[in-house]
């Protein structure tokens, strides 16, 4: 959503399966570009950060909203230089009927992330946080050696 909340977003985006809010049904907010696009003026304010990747100088972090999944429904793996996050739950009833959900996310790890020090946690409000420290560029992240002056 780099262009802001006023630009139409794809219907099948990260909010798929979330249900509609009242402002989604107002004609003022409907898009005239295509039936597969819609404007969601306030959703980015209400639900920002659904999937956020940060690569700071010292740390690499992925934050992913998985509130519809229990810990048993989630799988987090490192395969080669990628983090793979998979979630799936069977059909269950919610406010709008019956729904089943499944997602698969794959993120490339920066080369300088120390894979042996990666942590992953799930908060009570359903936010999955995956993070790992970065090693200085003159060090190999797979080794714990460092030059001593």
Curated annotation (Swiss-Prot):
Listed InterPro entries: A-crystallin/Hsp20_dom, Alpha-crystallin/HSP_16, Alpha-crystallin/sHSP_animal, Alpha-crystallin_N, HSP20-like_chaperone
Q: Which residues bind Zn(2+) 2?
A: 96
| Binding annotation for Zn(2+) 1 | 89, 91
Positions binding Zn(2+) 3 in this chain are 143
- GO cellular component labels: cytoplasm; nucleus
Mind listing the GO biological process terms from this record?
lens development in camera-type eye; negative regulation of apoptotic process; protein refolding; response to heat
The record ties this protein, via Pfam families, to: Crystallin, HSP20
Subcellular locations according to the entry: Cytoplasm; Nucleus
List UniProt keywords, sorted A-Z: Cytoplasm, Eye lens protein, Metal-binding, Nucleus, Zinc
Q: Which PROSITE patterns match?
A: SHSP
Q: Which residues form the sHSP domain?
A: 41-149
GO MF annotation terms: metal ion binding; structural constituent of eye lens; unfolded protein binding
Superkingdom to which the source organism belongs: Eukaryota
Q: Which CDD domains match?
A: ACD_alphaA-crystallin_HspB4
Q: How does it assemble?
A: Heteropolymer composed of three CRYAA and one CRYAB subunits. Inter-subunit bridging via zinc ions enhances stability, which is crucial as there is no protein turn over in the lens. Can also form homodimers and homotetramers (dimers of dimers) which serve as the building blocks of homooligomers. Within homooligomers, the zinc-binding motif is created from residues of 3 different molecules. His-89 and Glu-91 from one molecule are ligands of the zinc ion, and His-96 and His-143 residues from additional molecules complete the site with tetrahedral coordination geometry.
The family line of this record is: Belongs to the small heat shock protein (HSP20) family.
* Known function: Contributes to the transparency and refractive index of the lens. May act as a chaperone, preventing aggregation of various proteins under a wide range of stress conditions.
The record, for PANTHER family, names: ALPHA-CRYSTALLIN A CHAIN (PTHR45640:SF14), HEAT SHOCK PROTEIN HSP-12.2-RELATED (PTHR45640)
Please identify the protein, giving its name as recorded.
Alpha-crystallin A chain
Species source reads Anas platyrhynchos (Mallard)
Which gene name does the record give? CRYAA
């Amino acid at each position: 959503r780099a262009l802001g909340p006023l630009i139409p977003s794809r219907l099948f985006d990260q909010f798929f399966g979330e249900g509609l809010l009242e402002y989604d049904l107002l004609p003022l907010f409907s898009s005239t570009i295509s039936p597969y696009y819609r404007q969601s003026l306030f959703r980015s304010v209400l639900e920002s950060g659904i999937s956020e990747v940060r690569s700071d100088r010292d740390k690499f972090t992925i934050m992913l909203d998985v509130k519809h999944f229990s810990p048993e429904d989630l799988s987090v793996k490192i395969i080669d230089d990628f983090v793979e996050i998979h979630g799936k739950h069977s059909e269950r009833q919610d406010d709008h009927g019956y729904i089943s959900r499944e997602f698969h996310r794959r993120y490339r790890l920066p080369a300088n992330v120390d894979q042996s020090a990666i942590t992953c946690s799930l908060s009570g409000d359903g936010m999955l946080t995956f993070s790992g420290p970065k090693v200085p560029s003159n060090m190999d992240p797979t080794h714990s050696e460092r030059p001593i002056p």
